[in-house]
Each structure stands twice: as C-alpha cells, then as structure tokens.
Regions:
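N-terminal beta-alpha supersecondary unit
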Residues: 1-27, 102, 143
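Surface "functional belts" at beta-alpha junctions
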Residues: 50-146, 171, 176
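Stable alpha-helical structural segments in soluble proteins, enriched in small hydrophobic residues
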Residues: 9-13, 46, 64, 149-160
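Generic hydrophobic alpha-helical segments
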Residues: 2, 6-9, 60-61, 108-112, ...
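DPxDG-like acidic metal-binding loop motif
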Residues: 22-51, 56
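Acyltransferase
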Residues: 140-190
C-alpha cells in the first residue's frame, strides 16, 4: 500500500527532513485523488511541512520539457469525456494554454485542429487518440505517456507552498453519487 512505499522511498530520512511535499490534487479518480491528498495532509500536518498542489495534467505535460511541442494531457473521464489541458512546451517550460477541464471528444477534436502537431499523453491518451481521427496527433511513447514523480516535482517547482490544512482535492465534475443525489432532489421538486 501507499505508506510502506513512502517509507521505502524515504530510506533513512524522516518526514520532518522534507522542505515540502508535492501531490497531484486532481483531476483524476475521486478515490485516488482523495487518498493521495489525505495521505499528504496526514504526513505534512504534524511537522507543519508545506504542501504543493499540482495539476495531474500539468505533471503529465512536464514529461516533455525536453521538447518544443504542444502537449494535450488527457485522462479518461468516462462516457467519451476526458479531463484535459493543453500546454505549449518551449525552452524547457510548460505554458498552460487552457485551464483543466472536462471535455467531450468532439470539442477536443475541434480545439486540436488548429495546431500543426500535438503530442497526446495521459491515461486516456490511447482511447482519445483512437477516437480523434485527425492527422496532427502523435501518441506519446509509453515511457513518457503517464504521470511520474519527476513530472510532479517539475510542475511543483515554482508553485506556491500551502499548509496541509489548505490542501484540497480538485474535482472537475461531481462524482456519480453526487450526480445521482442531485437528480433525486430534482425529481422530488418536480
């Protein structure tokens, strides 16, 4: 599980030795985001270690800082929707072209047509690539396709440090349970 892995990575170091802890706070699976953020909050709180909240999509884009390109970070949000953000990678920096969003495959296709070449990466890259059907898309190689610790660290470099109490998950849409509850309330009103 997560805590034994953290202990193994830390080796002889203690949590109190850290200057900050970076975490991808979303978007992503509701459970995965909650577990990651809660774990970091728990680790950081006791020793008052600053936290850095990083977009999962930005962490993915940071895998390409050695190239000048457009990166389309995508995560499967189900029902042919994707969590997505676009980044221009230039001179070793990722410049955000749009905010993190939940987007349909058709809307994403329209957005991507204006670029000459786009590298598509993330856990939704293969599904997205297979359904876009446009020529300017390149599927990222497996070794750069997914988020990794290095990408999180690079994305966190110039971000604001916050307290563990201020660290919160970032969700781009309601969970299925929240959507169903909202629908039930709406049905009761009618």
């Amino acid at each position: 599980t997560l805590l034994p892995m953290i202990k193994r990575v830390m080796g002889d170091y203690k949590i109190s030795d850290l200057d900050a802890i970076a975490v991808t706070a979303g978007p992503g699976s509701f459970t995965g985001v909650r577990i990651g953020v809660a774990t970091v909050k728990g680790l950081a709180f006791n020793d008052n270690i600053p936290c850095v909240s990083v977009s999962t999509l930005e962490a993915i884009a940071c895998n390409f800082l050695d190239e000048d390109c457009i990166v389309c970070s995508v995560m499967d949000a189900r029902r042919m929707q994707f969590y997505n953000a676009l980044f221009e990678i230039k001179n070793g920096k990722a410049v955000r072209l749009c905010e993190d969003r939940a987007i349909s495959i058709d809307d994403l296709k329209n957005d991507l047509k204006k670029y000459e070449k786009v590298i598509i990466a993330g856990d939704g890259a293969r599904l997205c690539y297979d359904n876009l059907g446009i020529d300017n898309i390149i599927l990222a190689p497996e070794d750069k396709r997914y988020q990794c610790g290095q990408g999180v660290a690079l994305a966190a470099e110039n971000k604001e440090k916050i307290s563990a109490a201020a660290l919160m998950p970032v969700y781009l849409r309601l969970s299925q349970a929240e959507r169903e509850l909202k629908l039930q309330k709406k049905d009761k009103e009618n």
